[in-house]
């Protein structure tokens, strides 16, 4: 955590966005991550959504309250606004609830029933400012047929989940992402213009404690 905080201190920042999997599904690191969260809040406001790891926790509601209590803006299909340098920023944080391992299989074989997020995008549409959607799953930007997020009116989607494809092969690219499978399109980088999708490779490793040609990253958006 010291390395991450040191790097953050070198970056000019107004907001910190966390797109899920902040605490793993065994919750063994909760006390450390709460302490780390307090350090983040000393540096900038934190806007947070859940990932598949948090959603698998039995004490999910308790954890959400603890994160809110330390000062995180916990967004569970909710909007929030903040003014930075006289500019209004509007967040929509999505709680997509695609956490079960059986969900991964269903998504791969095309039988998964995605949640209808249109009501939340309709709420976002009523608000002004620069609109940022926080979504754990980058593939939902374009891969969910009639429910894909890119059809809606917003500026930027920030996502994670794919760990950069875990392994990146020279001349081939990212190898695997849960939910996308082999050679995923949305593993890292930027896609589109407006709306634009930025996929972070993130800082953690989850079940596979190894990366190959795939450095962890903190994404800086100007």
Where do the protein language model's features map onto the residues?
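Conserved beta-sheet core of the metallophosphoesterase superfamily
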Residues: 65, 138-219
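Solvent-exposed loop/turn segments at secondary-structure junctions
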Residues: 22-25, 52-56, 80-82, 96-100, ...
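Binuclear metal-dependent hydrolase catalytic cores centered on His/Asp/Glu-rich metal-binding motifs
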Residues: 69-72, 84-134, 141-148, 211
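Active-site neighborhood of phospho(di)ester-bond hydrolases with catalytic His/Asp-centered motifs
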Residues: 15-21, 45-52, 75-78, 132-135, ...
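Short, conserved loop/helix-junction motifs that constitute active-site signature segments
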Residues: 10-11, 37-43, 124-127, 147-152
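Acidic/histidine-rich helix-loop elements
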Residues: 1-2, 22-31, 54-61, 98-112, ...
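Short acidic-hydrophobic surface loop/beta-edge motif
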Residues: 78-85, 187-193
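Membrane-embedded segments
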Residues: 1-75
């Amino acid at each position: 955590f010291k390395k991450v905080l040191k790097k953050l201190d070198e970056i000019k920042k107004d907001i910190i966005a966390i797109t899920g999997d902040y605490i793993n599904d065994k919750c063994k690191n909760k006390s450390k991550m709460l302490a780390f969260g307090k350090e983040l809040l000393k540096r900038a406001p934190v806007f947070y959504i859940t990932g598949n790891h948090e959603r698998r926790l039995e004490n999910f509601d308790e954890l959400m309250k603890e994160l809110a209590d330390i000062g995180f803006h916990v967004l569970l299909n909710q909007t929030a606004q903040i003014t930075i340098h006289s500019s209004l920023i509007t967040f929509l944080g999505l709680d997509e609830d695609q956490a079960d391992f059986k969900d991964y299989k269903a998504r791969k074989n095309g039988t998964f029933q995605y949640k209808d997020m249109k009501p939340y995008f309709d709420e976002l549409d009523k608000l002004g400012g620069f609109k940022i959607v926080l979504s754990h799953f980058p593939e939902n930007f374009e891969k969910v047929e009639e429910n894909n997020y890119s059809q809606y009116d917003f500026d930027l989607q920030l996502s994670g989940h794919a760990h950069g494809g875990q392994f990146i092969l020279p001349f081939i690219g990212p190898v695997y992402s849960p939910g996308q499978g082999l050679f995923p399109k949305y593993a890292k980088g930027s896609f589109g213009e407006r709306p634009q999708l930025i996929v972070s490779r993130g800082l953690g490793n989850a079940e596979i404690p190894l990366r190959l040609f795939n450095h962890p990253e903190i994404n800086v958006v100007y």
